[in-house]
């Protein structure tokens, strides 16, 4: 489905609209199954509450101005805006966690403190649709034109598209100082230049946020850990889909507790950034 699908814009728009209609209903149904109740506040939901008696030893990250970067994964319209193609399944989680607002707070705090700030975006070019095999979510993303761009050197139709940066952050990202890496293509940064950009600036500690929690954020976390970075994940500056297959945010949160060097709220992250 993703390899030779019709690239006609009208067909693609129809697919995007169909997904928004269909997945909105799936999101509501899945939320009821997974969470067991209606619109509970995310961070106070029993589903997301930290264990009262954790078995794993505590760890933390001590950040500094010269060795720490804020890395935001996929702060893009397709993930974070009601206009985006994924809103039908991620919108509830984004709203619960105040993800858009919290990512903005991190951007502003990091800029004010003089930290390195990097964005790792997800883009697909026409040549990427020639892949011969893909996983389930890759197939879906290709079929509905998620993160599609006209080409690596072609910005036609980019402004305001699903692949564009959220308008709330666009001025901060395009300030001439933010690192905008080459795009990652599946989930993690092994296919882009994030590691190079951070190492060249002496960064060995990362504050990680963005979308989607159980996909690209989690993949970035694992890759950065394997490369020797200390990583603090900001738990309410991310979100994930709720579908019949499961609650992506809950799945990610469990793994964040297992492997991240630290797991902070936005309030805590901002406080620490302001103190460097």
Where are these regions (language model features)?
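Short hydrophobic beta-strand that contains or immediately precedes a catalytic carboxylate
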Residues: 71-73
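Surface-exposed, active-site-proximal loop segments in enzymatic domains
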Residues: 82-91, 132-133, 224
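A short alpha/beta connector and helix-capping loop motif
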Residues: 84-110, 115-116
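Short acidic, Gly/Ser-rich segments with clustered Asp/Glu that frequently serve as metal-coordination loops
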Residues: 76-82
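Active-site-adjacent betaalpha module
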Residues: 2-32, 42-69, 78, 105-113, ...
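Short beta-strand segments at enzyme active-site cores
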Residues: 115-122, 234
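Short catalytic/ligand-binding loop motif for oxyanion handling, primarily in non-cytosolic enzymes
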Residues: 125-129
């Amino acid at each position: 489905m993703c390899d030779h699908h019709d690239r006609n814009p009208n067909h693609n728009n129809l697919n995007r609209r169909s997904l928004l209609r269909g997945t909105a209903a799936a999101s509501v149904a899945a939320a009821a199954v997974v969470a067991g109740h209606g619109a509970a506040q995310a961070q106070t939901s029993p589903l997301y509450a930290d264990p009262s008696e954790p078995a794993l030893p505590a760890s933390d990250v001590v950040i500094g101005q010269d060795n720490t970067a804020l890395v935001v994964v996929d702060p893009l319209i397709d993930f974070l805006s009601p206009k985006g193609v994924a809103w039908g399944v991620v919108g509830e989680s984004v709203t619960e966690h105040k993800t858009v607002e919290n990512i903005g707070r991190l951007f502003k705090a990091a800029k004010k403190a003089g930290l390195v700030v990097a964005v790792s975006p997800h883009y697909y070019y026409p040549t990427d649709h020639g892949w011969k095999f893909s996983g389930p979510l890759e197939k879906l993303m290709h079929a509905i034109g998620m993160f599609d761009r006209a080409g690596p050197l072609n910005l036609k139709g980019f402004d305001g598209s699903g692949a564009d940066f959220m308008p709330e952050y666009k001025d901060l990202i395009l300030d001439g100082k933010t690192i905008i890496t080459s795009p990652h293509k599946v989930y993690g940064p092994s296919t882009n230049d994030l590691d190079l950009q951070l190492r060249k600036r002496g960064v060995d500690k990362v504050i990680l946020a963005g979308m989607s929690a159980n996909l690209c954020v989690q993949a970035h976390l694992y890759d950065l850990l394997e490369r020797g970075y200390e990583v603090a994940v900001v738990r309410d500056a991310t979100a994930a889909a709720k579908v019949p297959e499961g609650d992506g945010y809950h799945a990610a949160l469990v793994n964040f507790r297992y492997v991240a060097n630290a797991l902070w709220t936005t309030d805590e992250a901002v406080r620490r950034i302001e103190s460097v």
